Amino acid sequence: MNPLIPSDGASGFPGAPWAFKRAIAQGEELKIPTWGMGDAIISLVGAIGLSLIVSLTLMSQNIDPENGWGLLIAFSAPWLALAGWPILATTIKGNGPGIDFGLLAPRTHLRLGFVAGLASLAAASLIAVIVTRFTGPLSSSAGDVGLNQTGIVLVLFVLMAMFGAPIVEEIAFRGMLYGALAKAHLNEHLVVVITALVFALFHFEPKRFVILFAIGTILGEVRRRTGSTSAAIVAHIVNNTPAALYILVTALRT
């Protein structure tokens, strides 16, 4: 038994997060969530669809979706599906995201998330050195557009990349998708791999696929070991922070 996850009695909820197991152990009356893969698919496909619709709508109004306020709108619009649907689904079909996704977590889990974030940075850096020998220089789509921003748009974009994206993506991937796969009785290690694969593919950055897959694997392992999506959020924030700060500092200097 994983010592980081309390014993439960939540046998009807495979892959149940720490918060769910703790609540059961404390005698709280919870219901077995009925959300699942259908909701995970709605979240991911909905996010892609929203991204396309919003970008096309902005362009039809002569607003650049990769610059200024248009960028902020295009960047955040998919979050309505990516995080919004999982939150709605768990609220209606479960016990809310705090319990069903393990957003409630002890400090020990968050500290582990911080350490894992540092590990993901080290792994990504090492892999990047190897990958660039075959692909040439690497860059992220978010980084490229971020460097062209100024003023309040720049600051908001950096904050969204540093905090917003990790929170939203972890709710979608290590929260909803991970939970749905685990509820389908898949092996927990396979769940980590699948969520990492989908996470990497979702970014639509072929050159960075291996890097994103490695990061996703570490984030998934954090979720598996702790049972806390919040721990994965902390790790993701740590991973995104250096690049976000680089965008801010570099853009301010130009």
Predicted regions and their residues:
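Alpha-helical transmembrane segments of integral membrane proteins
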Residues: 34-46, 70-74, 108-116, 153-157, ...
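Hydrophobic/basic alpha-helical segments enriched in Actinobacteria
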Residues: 89, 93-98, 104-105, 113, ...
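Non-cytosolic membrane-interface motifs at loop->transmembrane helix junctions
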Residues: 66-74, 142-146, 217
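N-terminal, membrane-interfacial amphipathic/helix-forming hydrophobic leader that caps
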Residues: 1-112, 121, 125, 129, ...
